[in-house]
C-alpha cells in the first residue's frame, strides 16, 4: 500500500517538508533573518531523524516495488550521513557569519543534498539511484559556488558541475546498458541476469561504466581530478561537507550496486575495485607531500582514504563491507575534528589555509595543538588511535579474501602518507614562530567539536569503549547487504 511505502520514507519526507517550509519562511521575512536559526534547526532535525532511524528501524523492508530498500545497511549509512551533516552545520556557523555567507539557502541546499544521499543509499533500482545522485549533486554544485564574489569559488563550482555532469553521463550510459541487457532496472533483476558464467558482454560494459561513474563520486583515482581544485576553491564549510557526508553516501551506494546488482559476478568487478583502491592510496599519499595549502592536502588525503575504504569493498565479503563501514565512520569523525580547526585558522582576522601558518602553534595553544596532533596521528593510522583500527580492519579483510598484494600495497601507502601528517605536527611543535603564525582564536562550537572528536578518536580503543559500539551495527549492516 502507498501509505506503507511512504512510512518507509518518513525521514526523507520530513526533511523535504522542512526545506520547503524554510524557503517559504525566507520569502515572508527579511532577507537571511532566519539563516542562523535555520542552520541550528536543520542540525537539530538531522540529529532527531538519525535517532528516529536508529530506534524505529527493524529488519528489511521495500517500498515502491523494490525501488527503495530500508535495511540495516541503509540505516547505518543514513545515520552516519545525518550526524556528519549536523556536525558540519554546527561548526560552520562562526565562519559563515564572518565571511558573510550565512544565507538561508545554505541549510536548505544541505537538506536537499542529504535527502538525495539518503535516497542513494536506499536505492534498489537504477532509476532511484540516479534520482538520489542527481538531487545530491545539483544541490552541491550550487553550494560549491556560494561565494559569488570569489573567482576561485565560482571556478570550483563550474569544475564540479562539468566533471560531475560527465560522471553522471557515464553512470547513465552504464545504467542504460544494464537495463538493455538485463531487461530491468531493479538490482534484484540485474543480479539474476548476471548470474553464472554467461553474463552478457553488454552487461559487463554497463558494470564498467557504472563503476567509473561511482568512482568519480568517491574521488577515487584516476577519477579524482576535480577534488583538489573544488576542495581548495569552495568555502571551507562546503569543503568540510564534501569530505564527509557525500563520501559516505557514495561509498555505500558503491557497495550496494556491486553486491545487490552484481553480487553474482564478484570476480568481474573485484579486480577493478582493487585497482581503483591501490591507485587511489598511492596517488593520494604521494601527491599530498608537496602541498602547501591544507585544504588541498585534505583533498589528496581523502583520495588516499577512499582507496583504503575501497580495499575493504574489493574483498567482496561481508567482512570487507563491515570493515568499509567502520572505516567510513571513523574517517568522518577524523575529518569533522580536523575541519573544526581549519575553519578557525585566522591571521590578523583573515581566514588562511597555508600549512606554514601552523608554525609554533603549540606554544600559543597547547590544548588545541594536542587535539590536532591526535587527528593527524589518527589520519596517519598510528596506534592506538581509531584511525589505526579502521586501517587494520580493511587490511585484515583484504588478506582474508586472498588479496595479500593489496594489503601490502596499503601498508606501503600508509607509511608514505604518514609523512605529510607528521609534517604538520612537526610545524606546530618545532616550527619557528613568525609574523605569519595563526592568531589562535577559536569559537566555542568549533572548539568543542575539535576537542570532542579528539576525545572520540583518542579514547575509542579503551577497553569497555570498543570503538563506541559501531562494530555490531556495521556487522549487522554488512550481513544484511550480503545475504
Curated annotation (Swiss-Prot):
The chain crosses the membrane at residues 7-27, 33-53, 76-96, 108-128, 161-181, 196-216, 235-255, 272-292, 297-317, 323-343, 369-389, 402-422, 442-462. Coiled coil: none annotated. InterPro entries: NADH-Q_OxRdtase_suN/2, ND/Mrp_TM. It is found in: Cell inner membrane. It is a multi-pass membrane protein. It catalyses: a quinone + NADH + 5 H(+)(in) = a quinol + NAD(+) + 4 H(+)(out). Keywords: Cell inner membrane, Cell membrane, Membrane, NAD, Quinone, Translocase, Transmembrane, Transmembrane helix, Transport, Ubiquinone. One of its GO terms (cellular component) is plasma membrane. It holds the Pfam family Proton_antipo_M. One of its GO terms (molecular function) is NADH:ubiquinone reductase (non-electrogenic) activity. NDH-1 is composed of 14 different subunits. Subunits NuoA, H, J, K, L, M, N constitute the membrane sector of the complex. NDH-1 shuttles electrons from NADH, via FMN and iron-sulfur (Fe-S) centers, to quinones in the respiratory chain. The immediate electron acceptor for the enzyme in this species is believed to be ubiquinone. Couples the redox reaction to proton translocation (for every two electrons transferred, four hydrogen ions are translocated across the cytoplasmic membrane), and thus conserves the redox energy in a proton gradient. This is NADH-quinone oxidoreductase subunit N. It comes from Jannaschia sp. (strain CCS1). The gene is nuoN.
Amino acid at each position: 500500500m502507498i501509505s506503507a511505502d511512504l512510512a518507509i520514507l518518513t525521514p526523507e519526507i520530513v526533511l523535504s517538508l522542512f526545506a520547503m517550509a524554510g524557503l517559504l519562511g525566507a520569502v515572508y521575512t527579511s532577507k537571511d533573518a532566519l539563516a542562523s536559526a535555520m542552520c541550528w534547526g536543520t542540525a537539530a532535525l538531522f540529529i532527531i531523524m538519525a535517532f528516529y532511524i536508529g530506534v524505529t528501524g527493524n529488519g528489511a523492508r521495500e517500498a515502491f516495488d523494490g525501488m527503495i530498500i530500508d535495511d540495516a545497511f541503509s540505516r547505518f549509512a543514513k545515520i552516519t550521513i545525518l550526524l556528519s551533516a549536523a556536525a558540519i552545520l554546527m561548526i560552520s556557523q562562526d565562519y559563515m557569519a564572518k565571511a558573510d555567507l550565512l544565507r538561508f539557502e545554505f541549510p536548505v541546499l544541505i537538506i536537499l543534498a542529504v535527502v538525495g544521499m539518503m535516497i542513494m543509499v536506499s536505492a534498489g533500482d537504477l532509476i532511484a539511484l540516479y534520482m538520489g545522485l542527481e538531487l545530491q549533486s545539483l544541490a552541491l554544485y550550487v553550494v560549491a559556488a556560494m561565494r559569488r564574489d570569489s573567482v576561485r569559488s565560482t571556478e570550483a563550482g563550474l569544475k564540479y558541475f562539468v566533471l560531475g555532469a560527465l560522471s553522471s553521463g557515464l553512470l547513465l550510459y552504464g545504467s542504460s546498458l544494464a537495463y538493455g541487457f538485463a531487461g530491468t532496472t531493479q538490482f534484484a533483476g540485474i543480479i539474476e541476469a548476471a548470474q553464472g558464467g554467461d553474463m552478457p558482454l553488454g552487461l559487463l560494459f554497463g558494470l564498467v561504466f557504472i563503476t567509473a561513474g561511482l568512482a568519480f563520486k568517491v574521488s577515487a583515482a584516476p577519477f579524482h581530478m576535480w577534488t583538489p581544485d573544488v576542495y581548495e576553491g569552495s568555502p571551507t564549510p562546503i569543503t568540510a561537507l564534501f569530505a564527509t557526508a557525500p563520501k559516505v553516501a557514495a561509498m555505500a551506494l558503491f557497495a550496494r550496486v556491486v553486491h545487490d546488482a552484481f553480487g553474482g559476478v564478484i570476480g568481474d568487478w573485484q579486480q577493478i575495485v582493487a585497482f581503483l583502491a591501490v591507485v587511489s592510496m598511492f596517488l593520494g599519499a604521494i601527491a599530498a607531500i608537496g602541498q602547501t595549502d591544507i585544504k588541498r592536502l585534505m583533498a589528496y588525503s581523502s583520495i588516499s582514504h577512499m582507496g583504503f575504504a575501497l580495499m575493504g569493498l574489493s574483498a567482496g565479503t561481508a567482512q570487507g563491507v563491515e570493515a568499509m563501514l567502520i572505516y567510513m565512520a571513523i574517517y568522518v569523525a577524523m575529518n569533522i575534528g580536523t575541519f573544526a580547526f581549519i575553519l578557525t585558522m585566522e591571521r590578523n582576522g583573515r581566514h588562511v589555509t597555508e600549512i606554514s601558518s601552523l608554525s609554533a602553534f603549540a606554544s600559543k595553544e597547547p590544548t588545541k595543538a594536542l587535539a590536532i596532533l591526535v587527528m593527524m596521528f589518527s589520519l596517519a593510522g598510528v596506534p592506538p588511535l581509531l584511525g589505526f583500527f579502521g586501517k587494520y580492519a580493511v587490511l585484515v579483510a583484504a588478506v582474508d579474501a586472498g588479496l595479500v598484494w593489496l594489503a601490502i600495497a596499503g601498508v606501503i601507502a600508509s607509511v608514505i602518507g604518514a609523512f605529510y601528517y607528521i609534517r604538520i605536527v612537526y610545524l606546530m611543535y618545532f616550527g619557528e614562530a613568525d609574523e605569519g603564525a595563526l592568531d589562535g582564536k577559536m569559537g566555542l562550537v568549533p572548539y568543542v567539536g575539535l576537542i570532542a572528536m579528539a576525545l572520540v578518536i583518542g579514547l575509542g580503543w579503551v577497553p569497555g569503549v570498543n570503538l563506541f559500539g559501531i562494530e555490531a551495527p556495521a556487522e549487522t549492516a554488512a550481513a544484511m547487504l550480503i545475504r
